[in-house]
């Protein structure tokens, strides 16, 4: 096998990219189905649109066309639109300008007129010539109302008529004439009960006199101030004081007519419908006043009527995509969020991210490749949505500028991906992440439609509040889709010039800034998590670990005093190596300690108590210990998952606290549970991890082939079968092969032969024995047979401390200086058996007895094996012996003895 070296950023990225491409190729139909989701949803919308068109066309009653109601039927042809008298737009009676409060002008009427509904309508004038303004002011309104029924439109043109009702989107009908609301005749003075009947074709209504005031202001600043304060948003009392119109005569004189008109356009309820505004009559009014000033009262321009252009018969067109687009397409685009989030959480839940990190994959290449994949998938998805929607003729997509749509979707999908990376730091289970993600998707659409959409249309909700709500990506998406729908319904769609008017420019800026901020925060949190620190470390109260109690300090002093000779020698060897250098020593642990902070009133947990350990290259060191002894914490520190509380360890001379990324290049890990991709083959797994070890070209192929052969996964096409179809034993062998690919200098194996049959276990042990020739291996196991077969030295861990170190024979000789004698008889003969054992070995100790079966430890120096056989024959002559046995001390006995002794001592201390 080729020796590994540190893979560069691009080598790691290349390895992950190749693995991901292979993985996605195996899931090609899943990806195709995902990209086709927009097509299916667009077809669904098209089906609803076609069905709705059929229903509406059947329901449309075109038989009334040509009747008296034909102008109110939008589908009817109108070859001869009606002639309508032009009206002024005047404020409602309760909103007309009055004096008092925030208005400092005394020429306005008293606010008591609002109680009787008699407040006049006010028009403001300003300019550079006050006397001219006063003259024009007197010429604005007539003094009486008179009509000639034989020439109604011409006679009405001599009067100044107005209405409080706004126009619609066309001039086929005027609500001010056809409704039950009064038409006003604006005059300089009104007599009491001045009302006149008026018949306009088949419409019968009444005209009511309304006083008109023309008031002078010194300059346009005063006019602007008065108009602004007259709007309810412009004054602290939230009161409406509406001026009908205002004129700035500028430099107007007898030789020059130059005027600017202020008019009210804030009564537009639905901007998408683009209603007409009654401006022409305002212009005619001031023009006639100027002509009277120049030529006398008999001179005027008669503005007799307004008339819409003729139209053909049209069909009622209800654009369902524009109506439901914001809700529907919010759901469609947000469906990517659960896909991205669950993919990220899955790698965390299955610990695939961790195992890749342990084999040398840095956080930078992982983020770059993963982000690029999600971005590519997202852009394919939204581009498919736009293409499919345009292809089937949805105006929602066809009318809005494609470049505007592209930029909007590009910014949003980047924001969504960043948000998914951030959210993935919260979840550890795919099911939880899936439920929360889909809940957010549907809640975002519904809240966007029925809450956020209402706030967008509300004139009272502040813009800052809208921007604050748009900080949530779901609402920012809804806002953009809402604006697309509004502009598409107008018939012209959104262009780049419309960004400022619609507020999309601010939305683009907000999403872009939020994208980068969330991306940086998510990356920082992931960086902290990968270093073994809590991602929420900044939100925790800063505090140092509490110092141990006096009792705990005394206990540790006693432990040092009671330290076994072999453990002391190991510590002294490490201290000497640190002084002289560690050349040739693969692993050197120097006072490595891990303390978990206490919580809920509990004291800190000392998981690893100042470990000293030297493992040279070519040695397999076995770690034995009961559950909770600290083995996992030790391995996690050595593999970079946890930061040591104090002390350190050197791996090939590299400090795990400072150079962990370099350590990964020479490290292999075989975890307790197989961390594999079910759809990747054994060969593809090894190719990926080989590339992470910076093995290239033919050397990579050779290393993969040798690894597969060494664990019996090469022949019979097994190497090219998906790992998901492997048996448990085959997966275990593949995990061992992964840990050994690239000839790493240090390998950590956690119960490598778990789940294997005896034959496979022996083969695997042979592989590990061959691998350790140039490698330092630390192996944890509960199998004493495995430890005795593989390990050159063993260490027994109890309560975070190393209790003994040595090769298996030394430990059995040191802690097992006795034979184990077992005999099974009837219960009534138990005492006789015990007396006979005591007879040949006074210092023997019974360690077990149950239902006639007894086990004794007999010191070797007190008895010969022949004495035991002689005693058994003597016993058999006196009563029945069902079974008996004599055995030397096993490694399991040593482990049990050391562990129970240490635990008993620690509990007493």
From Swiss-Prot:
Residues that, per the record, bind ATP: 625-632
InterPro entries, per the entry: AAA+_ATPase, ABC2_TM, ABC_transporter-like_ATP-bd, ABC_transporter-like_CS, ABCA, P-loop_NTPase
Keywords on record: ATP-binding, Membrane, Nucleotide-binding, Phosphoprotein, Transmembrane, Transmembrane helix, Transport
SUPFAM superfamilies named among the record's database cross-references: P-loop containing nucleoside triphosphate hydrolases
GO cellular component: membrane
Top-level division of the source organism's lineage: Eukaryota
Positions bearing Phosphoserine: 555
Pfam families hit by this protein: ABC2_membrane_3 (PF12698), ABC_tran (PF00005), ABCA12_C (PF24526)
Subcellular locations according to the entry: Membrane
Annotated TM spans: 35-55, 320-340, 374-394, 406-426, 433-453, 465-485, 507-527
Domain ABC transporter: 587-824
MF terms in GO: ABC-type transporter activity; ATP binding; ATP hydrolysis activity
Gene3D superfamilies: P-loop containing nucleotide triphosphate hydrolases (3.40.50.300)
Name of the protein in question: ABC transporter A family member 10
Membrane topology label: Multi-pass membrane protein
Species: Arabidopsis thaliana (Mouse-ear cress)
Residue pairs linked by disulfide bridges in the UniProt entry: none
Family: Belongs to the ABC transporter superfamily. ABCA family. CPR flippase (TC 3.A.1.211) subfamily.
